[in-house]
Each structure stands twice: as C-alpha cells, then as structure tokens.
Amino acid sequence: LSLLMSLIFTFNILIGKETLQRQSRNLLHRVLGDTRMARAMHVISTLDDCFHNYIVGQCTEAVILGTLCTIGMMLLRLDYALMLGTFVGMMALIPIIGPYIGAAVGCIMLFSISPAKALEFLIYLFLLQQVEGNLIYPHTVGSKLKLPGLWVLAAVLIGGGMMGISGMVLFVPLTA
C-alpha cells in the first residue's frame, strides 16, 4: 500500500512540477525575504547540482562495472556473459546489497550449468568488486563531484558508520 501511495504521490508531483516550484518560491520569498531567499536559492541550486552529478557518477560507474563484468566473463568463456554483466551493472545502482544480488543470481544461473563455472564467476566478481570499489568508484563518482577519491571513500565510510546504507548514499554528495 505504501509503495502504491508513493507512486501516486510521485506522479502528482511530476504532473504539477512547475506549479509546485512557483508556489514554493513564493512561500520561501514571503517567509525569508529577498536576502535570505537569494542565499536559500543558492544553497538549493548547489545541492541540486551535487546530487545530479552524484547520480550521473553512480550511473557511469554501473555501466563501467557491467561492461567490465561482461568482458571478463567473455574472456573466461562463461555462459550468459552479456545478460549477467548487464544484470550486475544494473544491480550496482543499489547501494551495498546490489553487488551481492548480482553475484547470487549469476552464481545460481552458472551453477545450473557447472559448479566450477559458478565458482570461477564468484572469484572473478570478487576481484572485480575489489578493483571497482577501491579504484573505479572513488575516481568516477569523485570526478563528477570534483571531489578527490579519498574524500569519496571517507564519506562512504563515515556515512555508513553514522547512518548505515542511507548514510553511504547521502554523505558523498553532501561532502561535495
């Protein structure tokens, strides 16, 4: 029920986006005045840019991961390389648990063909995840946010320690 209500709410926001923006600006202008309104709009614009760039970085990282997974699986001559590589890339958009979902689905599919191929896939994906998580992700997302990779890793670790998965997602663009 809450999912349905969320979809309805989102749909209504999208339909009346321009009206909602105009009404929100009028309300903020009346409450804050000219000077504070200009500062508030600057902060909102900066946050919008940061979150937009973060999402673009996440999508870029997912495409890179999916492509590397597909290429590696083809080189290892594993079955379903294109399908599983695409799936792993899409699952990379889900913070923390996404890679595990991709690995589990791929392992189950390959296990039905050969347990050895499933193990080979898991080892390859584990190594790829290490490279992706420690090198590719900080560089890709960091470059979109104009933030050094070290700060991206620090934001993920601190955010995760303070707020769990949601902190990992929110702290990177907030750090920028």
What spans do the regions from the language model cover?
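Canonical bilayer-spanning transmembrane alpha-helix
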Residues: G72-M91, I123, H139-A176
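Amphipathic alpha-helical segments that mediate coupling or scaffolding at interfaces
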Residues: L27-R30, Y54, M90-L93, I108-F111, ...
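Hydrophobic transmembrane alpha-helical segments of multi-pass transport and channel proteins
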Residues: L93-Y100, S114-P115, Q130-E132, I158-V169
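Membrane-interface alpha-helices
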Residues: C107-F121, L125, T175-A176
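Alpha-helical transmembrane segments and their immediate interhelical loop/hinge regions
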Residues: S2-M109, L119-E120
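Alpha-helical transmembrane segments of multi-pass membrane transport proteins
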Residues: T60-E61, A116, Q129, L147
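Helical mechanochemical/support elements of P-loop NTPase systems and associated helical scaffolds
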Residues: G16, L20, V43, L47, ...
